[in-house]
Amino acid sequence: KEEEKIRSFSSSEIDKKILKDGWFAGNMPDLDLTNPELFRYLSQAYIWWIEYADVDGIRVDTYPYNDIQVAADWVKTFRNEYPNMNIVGECWVKSPLEIAYYQSGNNNKDGFDSQLPSVMDFVLKDHLHAAFNENESWDFGLPRFYTHYAQDFAYPDVDNVMNFLDNHDIDRFSTAVKRDVNKYKMGIAMLLTTRGYPQIYAGTEIMLDGIPGNYEGHRFDFPGGWDEDERDAFTKEGRTAEENEIFDYTRALLNYRKATPALHNGKMTQFIPYDGIYLYA
């Protein structure tokens, strides 16, 4: 049964069925990829868009909520056509072992292969949002990162894991660290110098705030780009002094990352946090 390929071996059959067949949300109906006509249509439609728009990567939303074997077959259609294209799956789960289950090439006990070259590290995001606000102890503060990276053995290709501070579904990182510039810079530094590769959400480069109470990313429009905007944060003159400080810091680290091959494919080494200092290379 394809239901058995849902990640939890202890889940009830009804839970597996609801996860696979139920709608993701009340206003987001699921498409039945087991229908061969729909499967072919979606495959052809995506290939058309890749060719038309010269797409160089795909993010598969809410991957585990699909019939994951059919989803794997669907992803494979793109990998057959574009073997060098990176395809990242949004697998929003709560442990590195669960995330690694969904990266292609993993030696899963049930034999499942997602065909996803890349997955998103939601657990690292959780640690980034929490660690800089906590006092150091066995399980909190900077030791969070040491424990997290110690589980990298679970990934078939840890260099192709996507790291991020925030996105459209979660609190802004600026909210998590209460706009503390030093904490914010530590988050940016870790994002751009750790194993894997970074995703930067629009506005993160200027410490953009969110709208309190909006559960989806606390979204503000990026200031600028339209005639009616009061200022243009795409320019130095249109940014505040604090925004320019964050922007310049982010740009400098991005240029450093671009010019440093070890950050692309080197082996990460970390040292146990001690006296408020966490060191890795």
Task: Give residue ranges: language-model regions.
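Substrate-binding/active-site clefts of carbohydrate-active enzymes
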Residues: 1-53, 71-82, 97-98, 115
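Short, solvent-exposed loop/turn elements at beta->coil junctions and helix N-caps
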Residues: 267-277
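Active-site glycine-centered loops adjacent to acidic/histidine catalytic or metal-binding residues
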Residues: 60, 168, 203-205
